[in-house]
């Protein structure tokens, strides 16, 4: 007798994997089970290694995730494998369940097998929810609050159960820590349930597409179905690797899983009364099944339903449809805190510099150029400009070289990249919206390269691949790139081109452009009190990655920095009193902005002037009140 059959432990492996008799007619839909086992192993292994570096404390969770992504060797691969593996886990599980529904795998004598699978499905969803809440993920605190509040529907004791789950009066540190503990524990319970699932499967064996007993024609699992499983395993690993390494955040959308899904799966095993089995022999049932699957595949977020009705004409007037369905609606050109989201000034398209250095003589962005100086910029060179412009306005241009380089480096940080092709030459690519074509055209005039329309999307791409242009571009942005991933690429390109790599400069009041905050992630609003607005407030939200930069501005301008739990772990810096606003307003006079938020900033001094006059509550029919209404309309229009 073979050793694999005589050994106590190997005989179990032999009966389940090697000599297990399988129907010869099963197709590739039966490969989903082996893929689910692979997904479970990937999730457990990557989860264990990430847990070695992750901290579940609410104050450290976000920082520990950043630590995994930046400092842990291949930590970003672990995290993306875990996140995308979870998405593929559910995809394969849904296909596995669809196969069971289509081929009637829930019927007797496999009722226990089906019910154990439903329990595994529920535990998997619970594990995914706990994981989303741990690291300020998709659901975050809001999702944890909503889902746990479902228990409040239980009569009499519902609210007490919710408080017990939270460990307090709201989702806080105890909640996240216990969620992480359960997120670590439940996968091992799932693994135990998988063993029970295999035990139930081993009793009656697999079903088959024909719907008849498979005992008439069975073949051993090895080597026939083992190699058949390996085909889908390699295909699965290839597709998973494509998402992990090339598009790791594509599958990060929320998935709404309804309770009715569990009920249907459980009732399928007890409600089937037909003498005939399997949908493939029933035309009407088969058609209905395909309609259900098509409906699930076409399900989208609620706002996308606007396209399916005649509401489009009504929304077009408010420009809502274009915003909802713009793929870049929440994407800034670059996300670094010291760079700004801006368009190149159209009036400077033919402006050139006679100097040999790579720095521009005048600012080429909409923040550093006022309209009344555009004509002068196009006629006079910098020497004549210095004689004409007063000292007050000259401060606008004195740091233009640094600002242009930071702005260009910001493009590369946010939506462009450096790369080396086959260790032969370096290249740089930048992608922007169509309306910003002039911006790329001016970069093309300065450094060379090509500008082309991207197919399939409303975007335009700048590409630079010649050595001379790359040397000029690198010298222009060297020391200004702050994104860690781009720094790695930038360093490799510098080595290839024999250029000294410069570390990112530290932000100061002289070399950082503060107005960029308010276009990318800052607001300038008014607080309301009744009908009159009390005071303006300026707010910036950043992650802990940029906290040290914001702390510098707190030292310069004052204000407060606090941790906002409701905004996915962001730090907020805000100033909201007249003295600090005056300091901030005076500083930004040298950095004019044409963005809507920048226009509001320069209305602050007028706001305080009018508000001080209105302090005595003038009657609403006076000229002073009418002046206030006129100012209010101007503020809203900006």
Swiss-Prot record:
One of its GO terms (molecular function) is RNA binding. Its EC number is 3.1.-.-. It is found in: Mitochondrion. Transmembrane segments: none annotated. The keyword Membrane does not apply. One of its GO terms (cellular component) is mitochondrion. The keyword Hydrolase applies. Its main location: mitochondrion. The mature protein may arise from proteolytic cleavage of an in-frame translation of COB exons 1 to 4 plus intron 4, containing the bI4 open reading frame. Cleavage would take place close to the Met-385 resulting in an active maturase of about 30 kDa. Residues 253-638 are annotated as: COB intron 4 encoded. Mitochondrial mRNA maturase required for splicing of intron 4 of the cytochrome b (COB) gene, containing its own coding sequence, and intron 4 in COX1, coding for the related homing endonuclease aI4. In vivo splicing requires in addition the imported mitochondrial leucyl-tRNA synthetase NAM2. Both proteins seem to stimulate the intrinsic ribozyme activity of intron bI4 through binding to and stabilizing specific secondary and tertiary structure elements in the RNA. In the C-terminal section; belongs to the LAGLIDADG endonuclease family. Residues 385 to 638 are sufficient for maturase activity. Forms a ternary complex with intron derived RNA and the imported mitochondrial leucyl-tRNA synthetase NAM2. The proteins do not interact directly with each other. This is Intron-encoded RNA maturase bI4. The lineage of its organism: Eukaryota, Fungi, Dikarya, Ascomycota, Saccharomycotina. The gene is BI4.
């Amino acid at each position: 007798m073979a050793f694999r059959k005589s050994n106590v432990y190997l005989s179990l492996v032999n009966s389940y994997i090697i000599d297990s008799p399988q129907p010869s007619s099963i197709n590739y839909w039966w490969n989903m089970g082996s893929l689910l086992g692979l997904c479970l192993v990937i999730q457990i292994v990557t989860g264990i290694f990430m847990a070695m570096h992750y901290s579940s404390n609410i104050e450290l969770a976000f920082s520990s995730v950043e630590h995994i992504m930046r400092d842990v060797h291949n930590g970003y691969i672990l995290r993306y494998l875990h996140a995308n593996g979870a998405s593929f886990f559910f995809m394969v599980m849904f296909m596995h369940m669809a196969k069971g529904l289509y081929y009637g795998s829930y019927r007797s004598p496999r009722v226990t097998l089906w019910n154990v699978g439903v329990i595994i499905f529920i535990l998997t969803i619970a594990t995914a929810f706990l994981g989303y809440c741990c690291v300020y993920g998709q659901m975050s605190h809001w999702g944890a609050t909503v889902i746990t509040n479902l228990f409040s529907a239980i009569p009499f004791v519902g609210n007490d159960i919710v408080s017990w789950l939270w460990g307090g009066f709201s989702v806080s540190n105890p909640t996240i820590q216990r969620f992480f503990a359960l997120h670590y524990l439940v996968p091992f319970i799932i693994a135990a349930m998988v063993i029970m699932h295999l035990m139930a499967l081993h009793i009656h064996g697999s079903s088959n597409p024909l719907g008849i007993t498979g005992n008439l024609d069975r073949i051993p699992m090895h080597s026939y179905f083992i190699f058949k499983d390996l085909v889908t395993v390699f295909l699965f690993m290839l597709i998973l690797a494509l998402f992990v390494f090339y598009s790791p955040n594509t599958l990060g959308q929320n998935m709404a899983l309804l309770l009715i899904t569990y009920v249907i799966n459980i009732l399928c095993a007890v409600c089937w009364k037909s003498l005939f089995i399997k949908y493939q022999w029933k035309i009407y049932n088969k058609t209905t099944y395909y309609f259900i699957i098509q409906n699930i595949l076409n399900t989208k977020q609620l706002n996308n339903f606007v396209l399916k009705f005649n509401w489009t004409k009504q929304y077009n007037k408010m420009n809502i449809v274009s915003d909802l369905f713009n793929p870049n609606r929440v994407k800034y050109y670059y996300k670094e805190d010291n760079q700004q989201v801006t368009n190149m000034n159209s009036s400077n398209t033919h402006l050139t510099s006679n100097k040999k250095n790579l720095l521009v003589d005048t600012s080429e962005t909409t923040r550093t150029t006022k309209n009344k100086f555009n004509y002068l910029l196009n006629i006079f060179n910098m020497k004549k400009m210095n004689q004409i412009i007063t000292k007050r306005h000259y401060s606008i241009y004195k740091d233009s070289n640094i600002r242009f380089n930071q702005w260009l480096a910001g493009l590369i940080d946010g939506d462009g990249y450096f790369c080396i092709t086959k260790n032969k030459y370096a290249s740089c690519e930048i992608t922007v919206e169509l309306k910003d074509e002039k911006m790329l055209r001016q970069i093309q005039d300065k450094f060379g390269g090509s500008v082309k329309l991207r197919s399939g999307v409303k975007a335009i791409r700048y590409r630079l691949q010649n050595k001379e242009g790359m040397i000029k571009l690198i010298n222009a942005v060297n020391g200004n790139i702050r994104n860690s991933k781009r720094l790695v690429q930038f360093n490799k390109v510098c080595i290839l081109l024999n250029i000294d790599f410069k570390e990112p400069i530290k932000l100061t009041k002289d070399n950082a452009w503060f107005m960029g905050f308010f276009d990318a992630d800052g607001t300038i609003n008014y607080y309301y009190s009744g009908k009159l607005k009390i005071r303006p407030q300026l707010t910036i939200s950043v992650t802990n990655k940029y906290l040290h930069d914001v702390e510098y501005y707190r030292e310069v301008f004052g204000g407060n920095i606090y941790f906002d739990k409701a905004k996915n772990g962001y730090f907020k810096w805000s100033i909201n009193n007249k003295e600090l606003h005056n300091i901030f307003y005076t500083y930004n006079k040298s950095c004019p902005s044409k963005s809507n938020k920048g226009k509001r900033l320069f209305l602050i001094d007028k706001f305080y002037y009018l508000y001080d006059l209105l302090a005595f509550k003038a009657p609403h029919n006076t000229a002073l009140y009418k002046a206030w209404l006129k100012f209010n309309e101007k503020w809203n229009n900006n």
